[in-house]
Amino acid sequence: MKKALALILAAAMSCSLVLTGCGGGNAAAGSASTGAAAAGAQSLTLATGGTTGTYYAVGGVMSTVLNKKLTKSSLTVTSTGASKANIQLLSDGEANLAIVQNDVMHYAATGTDLFEAEGKYESFSSVCGMYDETVQLVTTNANIKSVKDLKGKTVCVGDAGSGTEFNAKQVLAAYGMSFDDITVNNASFGDSADSLKDGKIDAAFVVAGAPTTAVVDLSTAAQVYVIPVDGAERDSLMKDYAFYTKTTIPAGTYKGQDADVETVSVRATLIAADDVSEDSVYELVKAMFDNQEELVKGHEKFNNLKLEDATKGIDVKFHPGAVKFFKEKGIDVA
C-alpha cells in the first residue's frame, strides 16, 4: 500500500530535473550539474516539494552549487507533495534524500498523527536542520491578544490532515483548549489570508518561514497582528513535543508589527535513506557548511544554516555520515 501510494505521488507530482540539465527552468530551482563528479559517484535523488515552493527552490540551489563540489555523489532534484510524500518516497526507494519538516519526520518515525494509519517508517535518518518554519498565529482582530482569546472564534488550522492542523491542535492543547473550543476552518495559507481580509474567519495558523508571502500580502490590505505562543504554555508545548524550538519573530517582519513576537518553530530538515553511504552523507553535509556563502547567493534560506542550530529539535536518529561530521565539530548526536 505504501509502495503504491508513493508511486502515484511520484508520477502525479514529480518533475525531475536531470543532471545533464533541462531547458526553460528557473536557475535557482535547477539541478543541472556543472561540476565533475567522479566516475562511479552515487547518484542521489533529492525529494523536495511543489515547483513553486521553498523546498524545491532550496533543493535546486543545493544541486547547482554542490554538484560542483561533490566527488562521492551527485544530486538530482525532484518535485513532490512535500514532507509526508517525501518520507514515503524514501521508504520505497524512489528517492535517497529529502527535505521535510522535523515534526512530520517525528510522526513517521513513531507512527503517530499523520502516520498513525500507516505505522512507523524506520528506514531513514536525520542529516541536519536547515531553517525554521515558524508557527504564526495571525489575526486582523485587535481584540485577540492571546491564544486563549480564540475560544468561540472561527480559526483556520491549515488544510485538513496537514502538518499545520496538528501544530494547531498541539498549541491549543498547551493552552488547555481543543478544536471543540473553536469553529474549525480548513484552507491553505493563501486562502486563509483572503478569508481574514474578507472577515470570514477570525484567525489563522500559518506554519512557514517568516516573513510568509501570504501574510505579507495580507498586511498591505489590513492591520495584521501575530499572537504570541510563549510563557509556561510554550514550555509545556516544548516538553511534550521535542521537535519544537523557541523562535522570535522580529519587530518589523510584517507591516505594522512594532514589537518582537515570541513563538515556536518546527525545522526544515534534510534526511537520508539509511542505505545512502556514510561517505556520501558526510561529504554532502560538510559541503553544505563549507559552501554556505555560495548557497546563500542562490537562496536566502541558507542564511539560516547554522552549526549551532543544525541538530536542534531533531529526535530522529542521525545518519552515520552526519554523526561523523558533527563529531568533528564537537557536537555529539550519537
Regions found by a protein language model. Give the residues of each.
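Pocket-lining segment of extracytoplasmic ligand-binding domains
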Residues: 102-104, 111-115, 179-270
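An extracytoplasmic/periplasmic, membrane-proximal ligand-sensing/linker region
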Residues: 191, 198, 208-228, 233-242, ...
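Pocket-flanking alpha-helical
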Residues: 60-64, 76-117, 137-140, 190-195, ...
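Short beta-strand-centered segments that line the small-molecule binding cleft or hinge
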Residues: 107-111, 122-129
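A bilobed periplasmic-binding-protein/Venus flytrap-type ligand-binding module shared by bacterial periplasmic
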Residues: 132-144, 240-242, 263-279
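Bilobed "Venus flytrap"/periplasmic-binding protein-like clamshell domains
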Residues: 41, 45-69, 73-77, 132-198, ...
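Extracytoplasmic
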Residues: 41, 72, 82, 92, ...
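Short, low-complexity disordered leader/linker segments with a strong preference
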Residues: 1-44, 334
